[in-house]
Amino acid sequence: RFKKIRRLGTLPGLTSKRPRSGSDLKNPLRSVKRSQYRIRLEEKQKLRFHYGLTERQLLRYVHIAGKAKGSTGQVLLQLLEMRLDNILFRLGMASTIPGARQLVTHRHILVNGRIVDIPSYRCKPRDIITTKDKQRSKALIQNYIASSPHEELPNHLTIDSFQYKGLVNQIIDSKWIGLKINELLVVEYYSRQT
């Protein structure tokens, strides 16, 4: 993880750690001109590692976004942001996306009253996300909510931290995406691969 954030910059979904400043690194004199391919590859890797996707999963999302109406890059980010594991991370119910994925796969999370154990489940507007009634599930979520820094919640989500309940109000607006990324470079990367 640390090698990834050192190379790609801050990835809030992967870890809360921050890369050191440039003066602390071992070899600050190695400033090589980056090729266009490398820039596109780094943007793709940022997206992949932030959301914790495999290469095949990201490629599938790019194909789905390409077939949808609208800007491919914007649709791609909306698809990734509406994944259940990412929604849990954004609500503050998990400290990282891998932590949220573990909550989902261990069957602690309900969507609209039904257990969902697939982290890539695509949430829709008006979905209600809650925890199981078991004490262990509630304790896990309570610890995450208490320990997470209270950042501003995106306007497409609302949380009731006393009932351990989150609500998806609408599809995310692009300005609320918490990752500094140029999604067009990711789309370009894949368009040049085929």
Swiss-Prot record:
Gene it is expressed from: rps4
The keyword Transmembrane helix belongs to this UniProt entry's keyword annotation: no
Taxonomic lineage from the root: Eukaryota, Viridiplantae, Streptophyta, Embryophyta, Tracheophyta
HAMAP family: Ribosomal_uS4_B (MF_01306_B)
PROSITE patterns in alphabetical order: RIBOSOMAL_S4 (PS00632), S4 (PS50889)
GO molecular function: rRNA binding; structural constituent of ribosome
Compartment(s) of residence: Plastid, Chloroplast
General function of this protein: One of the primary rRNA binding proteins, it binds directly to 16S rRNA where it nucleates assembly of the body of the 30S subunit.
Name of the molecule in the record: Small ribosomal subunit protein uS4c
Quaternary structure note: Part of the 30S ribosomal subunit. Contacts protein S5. The interaction surface between S4 and S5 is involved in control of translational fidelity.
